[in-house]
Amino acid sequence: MRHNKKFNHLGRTASHRSAMLSNMACSLIKHKRITTTVAKAKALKKFVEPLITKSKEDTTNSRRVVFSNLQDKLAVTELFKEISVKIADRPGGYTRIIKTGNRLGDNAEMCFIELVDYNENMAKEKVAKKATRTRRSKKTTEAAPAAEVPATEEPKAESAE
């Protein structure tokens, strides 16, 4: 039976788990990307995404609710001033988990967890893909007339012989 399996306990007491998730969420908000295990990243994603959604509405009550979970004034101010402005039009999915392999010491699955809108590499790749698609379409239109010209010249050469 699945009793007491609603979320991953991570081998910790409730107080230790809530303190750890609070500290990890503050680090994620401040640094925009952290390295951790996959299990902790999944637990952190469930913890931090509702807080980011709450930060879209900048009211005294929402600040108090977020502060009760984070317990860090700097993280709360950064969340409400910078991050909430950048993700205002996004309907959810504010974090991304990227697996990086296993840790050498204990073979634990490691990953990055990052805020989606703060990764410059992903934004550059999207622009590059659009540029390559337009080039390909131009090459095919230019290549088609060039292929027709040699085909018409070859029969003329054969008829002359």
Swiss-Prot record:
Q: Does the keyword Ribonucleoprotein apply?
A: yes
Positions with biased composition (Low complexity): 142-152
**Out of the domains of life, which is the source?**
Bacteria
Q: Where is the composition biased (Basic residues)?
A: 129-138
Keyword list, A-Z: Ribonucleoprotein, Ribosomal protein
- Read off the InterPro entries from this record: Ribosomal_bL17, Ribosomal_bL17_CS, Ribosomal_bL17_sf
Q: Which GO terms describe its cellular component?
A: cytosolic large ribosomal subunit
Q: Which stretches does the entry tag as region Disordered?
A: 126-161
A GO BP entry is: translation
Has UniProt tagged this entry with the keyword Ribosomal protein?
yes
- List the molecular function annotations (GO) for this entry: structural constituent of ribosome
Signal sequence extent = none
Q: How does it assemble?
A: Part of the 50S ribosomal subunit. Contacts protein L32.
Task: Say which family it is in.
Answer: Belongs to the bacterial ribosomal protein bL17 family.
Q: What is this protein called?
A: Large ribosomal subunit protein bL17
